[in-house]
């Protein structure tokens, strides 16, 4: 029978929390850069006059959404250095593992968030665009002032879900040696020769639950504020 000592959960928490900034940094960079790439993919599918760009965007989204995160992480970690050495004669052996994790997460997040952006844009009544143009706004002004706020409100719950999924995918970073929250937990288990594994993973779970709770509360607050502003 496996013994469980709750006090060790709180004993290990401070050590694991030291790795929290790295986890949050990976998530932040991925959301920022992945959203930019995702917006480009959504735009290519919605507004591109080139069939080639449309096909590329659709193929990208399909392939990346069908690729298991851990498979892509290993492909980037082992394949990107080989590719950069062959193409640019660039030695990346000294690069931080964080780079490979962020690149992987950006590729994955962009595929999922592009579908969120596309669906939200299509959900906005097309009469809004015509109304904006009819009062003298340019296409860009109409998009920024009228379409974007409405699309963001529609997309917000799915954006939150995408970020939560990203948080779970990013936990795989420990498999290539990155000492994030999950990696710190595994180091503790190794130092204790496999003992207190359940207590350690409980501490790790508490941190992820905390991140998810804060993110959900922020999302609900933003939804409430947007609904109140449109009331």
Protein language model annotation of sequence segments:
Residues 1-231:
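Transmembrane alpha-helices and adjacent helix-loop boundaries
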């Amino acid at each position: 029978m496996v013994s469980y000592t709750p006090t060790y959960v709180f004993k290990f928490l401070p050590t694991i929390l030291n790795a929290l900034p790295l986890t949050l940094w990976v998530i932040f960079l991925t959301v920022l850069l992945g959203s930019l790439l995702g917006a480009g993919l959504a735009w290519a599918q919605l507004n591109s006059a080139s069939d080639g760009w449309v096909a590329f965007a659709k193929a990208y989204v399909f392939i990346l959404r069908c690729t298991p995160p851990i498979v892509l992480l290993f492909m980037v970690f082992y394949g990107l250095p080989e590719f950069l050495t062959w193409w640019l004669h660039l030695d990346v052996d000294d690069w931080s593992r964080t780079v490979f994790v962020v690149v992987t997460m950006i590729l994955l997040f962009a595929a999922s968030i592009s579908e969120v952006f596309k669906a939200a844009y299509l959900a906005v009544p097309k009469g809004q665009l015509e109304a904006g143009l009819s009062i003298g706004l340019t296409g860009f002004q109409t998009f920024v002032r009228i379409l974007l706020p409405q699309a963001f409100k529609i997309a917000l719950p799915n954006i939150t879900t995408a970020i939560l999924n990203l948080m779970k995918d990013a936990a795989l970073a420990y498999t290539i040696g990155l000492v994030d929250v999950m990696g710190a937990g595994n180091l503790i288990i190794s130092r204790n020769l496999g003992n207190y594994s359940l207590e350690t993973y409980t501490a790790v779970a508490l941190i992820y639950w905390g991140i998810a709770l804060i993110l959900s509360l922020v999302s609900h607050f933003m939804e409430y504020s947007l609904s109140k502003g449109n009331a």
